[in-house]
Every structure is written in structure tokens, then in C-alpha cells.
């Protein structure tokens, strides 16, 4: 099967030509500020016009809550589209192709689960993306768990500290408000008094204790989330992805914190095999229907 895969993020939109499960071509462009889905759908199709006639279907993965009506941002700070944003229906109307849409972390969770060796006998798994925000997807009893309203897996908006920083979702102390790329970036600017990208911060952390502490705070928040999920869902595995989650040394910090806790709460973490494109590949793998609830 040939699928046009689209991954909608807070800062970029990635496009992929996925043929029989393999990413053949890829491109991306900055997420634009748009007021209607038709404008964005036309821009997306213009970027991949050379692939369009050859694909069988279009798969979308997106940050936010996905419903039949479209995309709704849980945290408007990570996605500024008006809601609900009917991108899927506009892409179908303009292209004539069948279109499916999933939350990005749910899509990545399903892709990552399908890549696991059967010998691992993983029944319950979580995927956590640490990027602009913090998202998640859950596979329970070897089925993607979305819930009645597709809200399952929004674990970035579980609260670690009720007195913590205000999140864009209007709760205080969410994992996203403590551990996300946006949170790290805000902390770095407050600490150093100037704009520092997260790439620069990770480089600085190799020899600067303050920078290292900022990253450690994020990693420990994600580790605590993993521990909580193990206690709640008896997870066999947590897969971590995203620009921050896959940054050099980050996963080791998460696992080291987990390994210091009581054994019953510990869970193995591993990097996404889809690397930075797990969500993009997950967009295409929606058409792998087996156990996709």
C-alpha cells in the first residue's frame, strides 16, 4: 500500500511517501498560522503534488484531540488552529483519497508496537513523545487504546505537582508544563537571560551544571510519569520519542531515575525505532487494522 503520511506538529508539518511500510521520501515545512482547514489542506497538497497521484490513501497524525469533527488543541500554546479543525475532510474533498486521522502519539504508539519482536511478549506499552509538548499513546492487551472520546493517552496533562507551573490546558503542574521542550526553553531563558535553543542547551549541559539541571528536571518528570503508568497499567515497556526524548543522553537520565525506585514500579524504557519519524510512520500505519481499536 502507498500512503501519503502527514504529521502535524506545533512547530513543523512533516510529509512522507510511505510505500509498503517504508518511508521513501520525506519533506517538512514550518507549521503555518492559518484560520481555515482548506488553506492548510491546499498548502499540504502543493508540497507533495509529485506523490499524490500514486498514493492509495492519506494518513494524518496530529497533536491534539482528534474527533469526527476535526482537530482540537488541548493546549493552544502547542497548536494554534481554530477548533474543531476539519483538516481530514478537506484533504479528502480536495484529493478524492480515503483519509484517516489519529492523535500523533497514538499513531506512534501503534507503529512502535507493531515493530516489536513477538518474543518480547509485550501486552501493555506506552509511547511518550517529549517534544514541543508531551504526548502519549497506550497499547493495552495488544490493542491501541483510544477511549470513547479518543482522549486516552494524553498523559502529558496528568499532574505531577498541583502547585507547579500553569499549563496551557489550564491545570497546574502537568508533566507538559514541567518536562516539555517549551518548558525547558522557558526555564533556560529565565536562567540565562537570553534565548537559547534546546539544541544549544543540550550542548551546554555537557559542561554547565545549570543547563544540566534543567534537562535533569525534565527527565525526572518523565521518569516519574513512567513509574506512575507502571503502577496504573502494569506496563511491560515504555517507548520514548520526540526531539527532546531522543536527544543525546536524555533517555539514560530517565532510565537512571527509574532504576533508583522500588523494583515493583520499575519499567524498561527504550528509544523509538521510528526515531524522529515515529509519528509520521504511525500516520501511515493506521491502515494496518489488526487490533487497532
Swiss-Prot record:
Print the keywords alphabetically: ATP-binding, Carbohydrate metabolism, Kinase, Metal-binding, Nucleotide-binding, Transferase, Zinc
Give the pathway listed in the UniProt entry for this protein.
Amino-sugar metabolism; N-acetylneuraminate degradation; D-fructose 6-phosphate from N-acetylneuraminate: step 2/5
Q: Which reaction does it catalyse?
A: an N-acyl-D-mannosamine + ATP = an N-acyl-D-mannosamine 6-phosphate + ADP + H(+)
Q: Is Zinc tagged as a keyword?
A: yes
Molecular function via GO = ATP binding; N-acylmannosamine kinase activity; zinc ion binding
- Answer whether the UniProt record assigns the keyword Transmembrane helix to this protein: no
- Top-rank taxon of the source lineage equals Bacteria
Recorded hits in InterPro entries, A to Z, give:
ATPase_NBD, ManNAc_kinase_bac, ROK, ROK_cs
A Gene Ontology biological process in which this protein takes part is: N-acetylneuraminate catabolic process
The positions annotated for binding ATP are: 5-12, 133-140
In which residues is Zn(2+) bound?
Answer: 157, 167, 169, 174
Q: Which Pfam families match?
A: ROK (PF00480)
Signal peptide coordinates:
none
Task: Provide the E.C. number(s) assigned to this enzyme.
Answer: 2.7.1.60
**Assembly, per entry:** Homodimer.
Q: What does this protein do?
A: Catalyzes the phosphorylation of N-acetylmannosamine (ManNAc) to ManNAc-6-P.
Family from the record: Belongs to the ROK (NagC/XylR) family. NanK subfamily.
Name of the molecule in the record: N-acetylmannosamine kinase
Taxonomic source organism:
Vibrio vulnificus (strain CMCP6)
